[in-house]
């Protein structure tokens, strides 16, 4: 049978045994990839600095997903939070990876068994002796089992009743840890940033799935609905399954890109909107103001800012700064962060405090402009020196650092002041090691960006797949060339040409 590449799946169209086999093999491939990828990431992951070189800076993709589900320890003796562990237990990162690989092997063997032993009694209609599947019944079984898994995850794993809980953090991604979560049954449960909603929604959705599954197991679909929705056609199953998958892909692309309790910034990096809105900058200034209100000096107030919080307020951690075709981790772009230099405060010769305008997300270059607290431009780095009025030299701008490695250091040399003004466009200033990884200095996206791009793209492709297969199954008679006005029962293969006008017509 000379099938073109895009038609090869017809070999399992009317073969339930081998249809099952290829799906088990697909599960083997997915699970095997997950386990192998986890082992690869663990081989290259450096857990030594969870603050300035976290997993998302290193381009880890599957480690964050394991961590958000409660895995924090490694058989290598390290913990994701930076400490050491002596007894990580079986469910470490390596344990989960190994379990996926073992499961993949078992699925591989099961797929081979079902390919060889395809002609099983269970797949045959006892009335006709031909292969057939009771698709509404199978739908009920799968819905029931999915409901049980969903309910179990929400009621046991997330709540810590039987399981570790999930990763929970504060709004600024500073205090994250794995902990049990109580279900949120009030209106707050609909807030995408409330972890309790994860537990309550899984419990509710699981309960609904169990009830719906039992309904579909006990109630047969009406004949008109069965025929109208082509419930006897396996391509209907394909079409509706693709719909479920593309819908889920669109949803998770949104929760990843815009942020939610399911995508903590400690595991996936900050979102672009946190840079756009000055989210971390506002929190830093609030903390400094509180420190000054407690009679701390400016230097002491800035020194109390956690390095982790300052690092979030750096444009290099913005997932929208990476180009679409710039492969590699963030560390391969601007380098490995070594330390926070401190917060630079610029002043003109009249003593006014000046603020550097920050670079918007979608700019590669941006003019260096310093404004006062009222937003009036007081200094800049001019493009044309001949026409400049606000140059650093003319205005006499100086810079002094507070907190960080350069705490208390000040510069009045114009070249140095301009250097730090340029770097202030990018947020807080960090020392970056570009030599170790031969980093090229061009920003990369975080796993947050890659996940969103991948899932949004595949969701769009799968959307078209749903339309394609849905149309094929709904209009199968039209595509097959059968005259819709034909009132005789025509059997495929009985006549030389289906829809031939010489075919005898008789009322059904």
UniProtKB/Swiss-Prot annotation:
Alphabetical UniProt keywords: Chlorophyll, Chloroplast, Chromophore, Membrane, Photosynthesis, Photosystem II, Plastid, Thylakoid, Transmembrane, Transmembrane helix
GO cellular component: chloroplast thylakoid membrane; photosystem II; plastid
GO biological process terms, semicolon-separated: photosynthetic electron transport in photosystem II
Source domain of life: Eukaryota
Annotated transmembrane regions: 21-36, 101-115, 140-156, 203-218, 237-252, 457-472
Principal place of residence: plastid
Membrane topology value: Multi-pass membrane protein
GO terms assigned for molecular function: chlorophyll binding; electron transporter, transferring electrons within the cyclic electron transport pathway of photosynthesis activity
Subcellular location: Plastid, Chloroplast thylakoid membrane
InterPro entries in UniProt: PS_antenna-like, PS_II_antenna-like_sf, PSII_PsbB
Subunit field text: PSII is composed of 1 copy each of membrane proteins PsbA, PsbB, PsbC, PsbD, PsbE, PsbF, PsbH, PsbI, PsbJ, PsbK, PsbL, PsbM, PsbT, PsbX, PsbY, PsbZ, Psb30/Ycf12, at least 3 peripheral proteins of the oxygen-evolving complex and a large number of cofactors. It forms dimeric complexes.
Family of the protein in this entry: Belongs to the PsbB/PsbC family. PsbB subfamily.
Function: One of the components of the core complex of photosystem II (PSII). It binds chlorophyll and helps catalyze the primary light-induced photochemical processes of PSII. PSII is a light-driven water:plastoquinone oxidoreductase, using light energy to abstract electrons from H(2)O, generating O(2) and a proton gradient subsequently used for ATP formation.
Name of the protein: Photosystem II CP47 reaction center protein
Organism for this UniProt entry: Oryza sativa subsp. japonica
